[in-house]
C-alpha cells in the first residue's frame, strides 16, 4: 500500500533504509543484509539519486517526490502480487508527478506486480491504468478498458467526469496580450536599469 501522503507515513526518527526493509526483515522474508541490498535495487529502479546511500537519510532530508518513491520501494520490498496506490501524486507538483508516475509504472512492470490506482486525477488514470473502474458513493458505475472508457464512456456519470476534462480553453495567439504596462522604471541600487518602458 502506498499512501497519499508519504511525509505522514514515515517515522522521522528512523533512516529510510530501516523503514524500507522493516517488514521484510520482521516477517523473515529476507535477512538484514539481503534486505538492504534489495532496497538499493528498488531505489535504483525507482530512479532515486544515489541509490546505495539515499537510505541513510531521514525522511525530512529528501524531497516529496523522493519520499513517495521510497514509500513505493517499501511497499515493493516483500514483492507483493498486488500493490495499491492511494492518490499517490496528490501532494506533488506536476513535474514531480510525471517522474513519480513513470517510476511507479516501471517498477510495477519490472516486478510483474498488479496495481490498483485510487485517484480523482484523470491524467493519472489515462497514463497508468489498463482498465478503469468508475465508482460513485462506493458503488461501481462503469468498467472498461482505458482507451474505450476515455473515448466513449457509457454511463451519464462517467460522461460528466470526462466532459470536465474536455472543456476547451480559450485559444490565444502569440500576439495576444495578457497584460499591458507603460511608464515602468526600475533601478538596481542607484543605477537605473529601465526607464519609461
Placement of each model-derived feature along the sequence:
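A short, surface-exposed alpha-helical micro-motif characterized by mixed small hydrophobic
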Residues: 125-127
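C-terminal boundary and immediately downstream tail of ABC-type ATPase nucleotide-binding domains
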Residues: 49, 151-178
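Helical segment within the ABC ATPase nucleotide-binding domain
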Residues: 98-111
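Q-loop/switch helix immediately C-terminal to the Walker
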Residues: 5, 12-26
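Short, glycine/charged-rich "phosphate-handling" switch motifs in NTP-dependent
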Residues: 131, 143
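A short, proline-enriched helix->beta-strand linker immediately N-terminal to the Walker B motif
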Residues: 77-81
